[in-house]
Amino acid sequence: MRSWIKTALWLGAVLPAGTALAASDTEAAEDRLRPEERPQQAHDTAGSLALASLTTIRPMARKSIAPAAQDALAPAREADADANAGFQRWITAFKIRAQTQGIGAATLRAAFNGVIYDASVIKRDRNQSEFTKTIWDYLDSAASESRVRNGTKALDAHRNTLERIEKHFGVDKEIVVAVWGLESSYGSFRGDMDIIRSLATLAYDGRRGAFFEEQLIAALKIIEAGDVDPRTMTGSWAGAMGHTQFIPTSYLDYAVDFTGDGKRDIWSDTPTDALASTAAYLKAFGWVTGQPWGIEVVLPRSFDFTLANRKIQKSPREWADLGVRATDGRPIKDHGVASILLPAGGTGAAFMIFKNFSVLERYNTADAYVIGVGHLSDRLKGGDKIKGSWPRGDRALTFTERKELQERLTRAGFSTEGIDGRIGPKTIAAVRAYQSAKGLMPDGYASLSLLEKLR
């Protein structure tokens, strides 16, 4: 939730032109799907949510190592020991800061009992996968037959609860289940990392220290409130928690007690509070009851691709006047103003997206993620697969290639206003400008063929 809820770029996310997604170095992508996020103008925020089985509170002890290997590992052990010594000094100072924000001494003692520096968390945080997967590969997994089948079972198993949630918050039960399916594979991968240890390690590390210290304070407030014991407060390495992966600040702002037991328990094997909290979160960000997230459309041959821009909104009737139709050839019903989205350029599937698309972006800003949630929810309602074709002969640009594309566009006079390897609105605008200047289809698609033209 831009929550992934509040800041999901904390997982280092960004979706290149809605085309490619960073490959996960953690959980199996088939089970838990969080793509790289699309950069935004001035936010480092997204959602909040996690994975894995809720069993291990502390990392398992290292296996014994042959004597010959012990000497080779000695420098690493010394580095870990040095890091932990500094970490413990940081914790001492942090506890003083935490107490000034209302965290009690008893909570601090319980939360930090036995907590040591976790080098594995920093390794994951530092990992920047060079290789990416295309949006069509991501969607193949997001709405795979097994995920649809398991989602249907989850809907049936929790139908009464989901119908009450839908009635109370006005958010489609299939949307809630689709988020659940992508975030933790319907609760199968909720995360087994110690949240306090992970957040403290990340806050101490300093790369995004202020953000993670804020999350750590929020996590301690959750413990202070009695919603969870620190030893069962588990989640992802980056601090996302529960069935639908809330980060601590988002939990404080949006989690709800839907069972009425006095706790907002998103960690329980019973997903009621987590699912209701997801609906509450989406409602808080303006979910429009009865409005689709988006609808697949067919564009006329004469379509002006410069109109496929998030800043350009028209009513479905106005789009129909321009020849835009549903895949069955009919005009789209009036669900409010909408934009046209081409996540893989003019040769891929096209979508008419409504306000609820932007609401889902509060969970994760990547186009692929939002389409994944939306399409999975449609499949859970009995809808069809995406009918449009994808340029499956293409491959996604690597991180290095994305930076090269930005560099070459900028040198050619089409500034991307930064070279970061993240294909966001400014880079897409530069791509469009270049395409228009060269007489190419101005669809904003950052492809390998475009890069080759720039070389």
Identify what each model region corresponds to.
Residues 22-24, 405-408:
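Non-catalytic peripheral regions of nucleotide-handling enzymes
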Residues 1-25:
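Sec-dependent N-terminal signal peptides
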Residues 103-335, 348-351, 357-399, 421, ...:
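Catalytic glycan-binding domains that act on GlcNAc-containing polysaccharides
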Residues 90-94, 161, 198, 277, ...:
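A general alpha-helix detector
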Residues 397-402, 410-454:
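Short acidic, glycine/serine/threonine-rich helix-capping segments at coil-helix boundaries
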Residues 78-110, 114-117:
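Mature N-terminal segment immediately following signal peptide/propeptide cleavage
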Residues 21-85, 106, 385-389:
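Proline-rich, low-complexity linker regions of envelope-associated factors in Gram-negative bacteria
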Residues 70-79, 91-94, 137-148:
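Acidic/histidine-rich, surface-exposed loop or edge segments in extracytoplasmic proteins
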